[in-house]
Amino acid sequence: MKRITKFSLLLSLVLGLYFPTVFAQSNMTNEMFDLAKLKSGVKNKRISSTDPTGGNRDHLEPFKPGEKRIIADIKGTGVINHIWVTIAPPPPTLSRNDIIIRMYWDGNDYPSVESPIGPFFGQGWDERYNYASLPLSAGPENGTGLSCYFAMPFEKGARIEIENQSDRNIDAFYFYVDYLEMAKLPKDMGRFHAWYNHNLT
C-alpha cells in the first residue's frame, strides 16, 4: 500500500510539472502570446466616420433610400481585423435587413461579401440583442453596436460599400474599419467570403 501511495504521489508530481510546461509550449502561438511579438513592416490603420472638425458629429450624413456609400477604399496590401458599426434609427424603425454590406478584394468588380448588415453581424430575424462570440459581438443596450473580428486579407486593395435598400433615410451611420497595412501578406492567406442565403426550412 505504501509503495502504491508513493508511486501515486510521484506520478502526480511528474504530471504536475510536465503538463503545465507542455501547455505553455503549445500555447505560445495563441493571440495573447502574439501581442508581445515585435512586428516590423506592419502598421495599424483605421478608417472611421469621425468628425474632421473635432466636433461630436462622428457619423456619416443621412443615406437616402436607394443610396450607396463607400465607407472604406484601401489601397495596397493588408488585413482588415475589426469592423464596428452602429446605425440610427435602430430596429424596428429601420430594418437592418434593408441595409446591405458589400466587400470587394484586390480590385475585383464582384463582391466577396454581400449580406444584409444585421445577419452579417449575427443579428437575425430583424431583431437586436446583446451577445458575444469570438468573431462577432453586439452590445450594449440591446445590440446597438455591432463588431466583427474576422481576418480579411487583401493584396491589391479593399473596398467596403453600404447600400440603403429601405424606404426611409438612415439618419446616422457610425463606423470604424481597423486594418494592418503591410508590404506583403504572410504565406497561405486566403480571402474572406460571406453571402446571405434566405431559404424557408
Residue ranges and their predicted role:
Residues 2-3, 19, 27:
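A detector of low-complexity, intrinsically disordered, Ser/Thr/Gly/Pro/Ala-rich segments
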